[in-house]
């Protein structure tokens, strides 16, 4: 099985095209990653290699997941389409994503990130497709663009023509500085769907605000209207998103569009599994724990390989 939602983290080493702001290095997520993975921010090349080695070890331990989509992260772009580093928390370059994916094609697929606001967005899509990208990932809340803006229809048409799925963050964004949280509303992905793009709403289209889940009506409409609309299961064991797991349990028609994903390196928690399954989940490897929790709740997932256009 493929995990469709795995983040590629990297520090800038002078060659990989990545960027991270001083502010981002002080944020809880960066401190958590440094602690959990024993990363030395003063030795970027070593830290980057160790992150990949750790991910490969987790994949070796998994009986369920054999390949993952590595996700990049584009930056914020100004009105002229130029990169605005003053508003960019971090950037994981497509060059780096493609390079790492090529290094282990048996384990990694490339999930590039292209902000449609960038001046060369269409050219970058063409390049990524030619170099074997599996999908395009966006995080509108932090990348400061509105997915519903009509100016991006040519971008969506290019995605459809190139048969590149669009994996879009849904809900509130806490790990980065979410500047416009309304951009995480899945209803804003309608233009992409109307243009024929295979759209995957991240995190089960949950809002990320604990019990408040306002997007269920939109999700049910999209499932009924668009055969090329999907959701992924990433981050759904986290307390602020777990409510959507129990909603999915009650809606088998939505489950039919659910794709397996975790949101690595964020934690996968065992507590939604009940009874003896809890112990099984708690003892399982990282990727298998997600599979055990979902199975315990009677939630089935599709494999990303089966839904690519």
Regions found by a protein language model. Name each.
Residues 1-71, 77-88, 305:
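An N-terminally biased module of ancient metal coordination in phosphate/nucleic-acid-related enzymes
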Residues 63-67, 104-109, 131-134, 162-164, ...:
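Short, well-ordered coil/turn segments that N-cap beta-strands
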Residues 205-309:
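H/E-rich (His + Asp/Glu) clusters that bind or coordinate divalent metals
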Residues 2-6, 68-71, 108-112, 136-138, ...:
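Hydrophobic faces of well-ordered beta-strands that scaffold small-molecule active sites
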Residues 7-11, 75-78, 116-120, 143, ...:
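Active-site environment of divalent metal-dependent phosphoester hydrolases
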Residues 73-181:
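Active-site gating/metal-coordination segments in enzymes
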Residues 119-129, 147-152, 177-193, 209-223, ...:
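Distinct, well-ordered alpha-helical segments
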Residues 18-20, 39-45, 77-89, 175-183, ...:
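Short, flexible/disordered intra-domain loops and linkers
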């Amino acid at each position: 099985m493929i995990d469709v939602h795995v983040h590629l983290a990297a520090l800038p080493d002078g060659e990989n095209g990545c960027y991270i702001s001083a502010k981002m290095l002080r944020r809880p997520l960066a401190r958590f990653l440094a602690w959990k993975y024993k990363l030395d921010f003063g030795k970027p090349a070593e830290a980057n290699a160790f992150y990949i080695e750790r991910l490969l070890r987790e994949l070796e331990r998994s009986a369920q997941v054999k390949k993952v989509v590595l996700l990049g992260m584009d930056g914020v772009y100004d009105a002229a389409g130029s990169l605005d580093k003053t508003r960019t928390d971090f950037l994981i370059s497509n060059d780096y994503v493609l390079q790492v994916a090529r290094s282990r094609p048996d384990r990694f697929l490339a999930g590039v990130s292209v902000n449609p606001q960038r001046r060369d967005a269409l050219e970058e899509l063409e390049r990524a497709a030619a170099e074997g990208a599996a999908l395009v990932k966006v995080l509108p809340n932090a990348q400061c663009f509105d997915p519903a803006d009509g100016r991006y229809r040519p971008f969506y048409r290019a995605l459809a023509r190139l048969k590149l799925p669009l994996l879009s963050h849904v809900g509130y964004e806490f790990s980065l500085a979410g500047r416009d949280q309304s951009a995480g509303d899945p209803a804003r992905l309608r233009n992409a769907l109307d243009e024929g793009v295979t759209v995957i709403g991240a995190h089960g289209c949950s809002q990320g605000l604990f019990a408040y889940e306002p997007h269920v009506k939109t999700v049910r409409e999209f499932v009924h209207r668009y055969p090329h609309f999907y959701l992924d299961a990433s981050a759904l064991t986290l307390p602020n998103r777990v409510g959507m797991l129990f909603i999915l349990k009650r809606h088998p028609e939505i489950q039919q569009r659910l794709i397996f994903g975790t949101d690595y390196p964020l934690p996968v928690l065992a507590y939604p599994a009940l009874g003896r399954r809890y112990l099984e989940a708690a003892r399982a490897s990282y990727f298998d724990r997600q599979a055990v929790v979902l199975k315990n709740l009677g939630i089935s997932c599709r494999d990303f390989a089966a839904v690519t256009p």
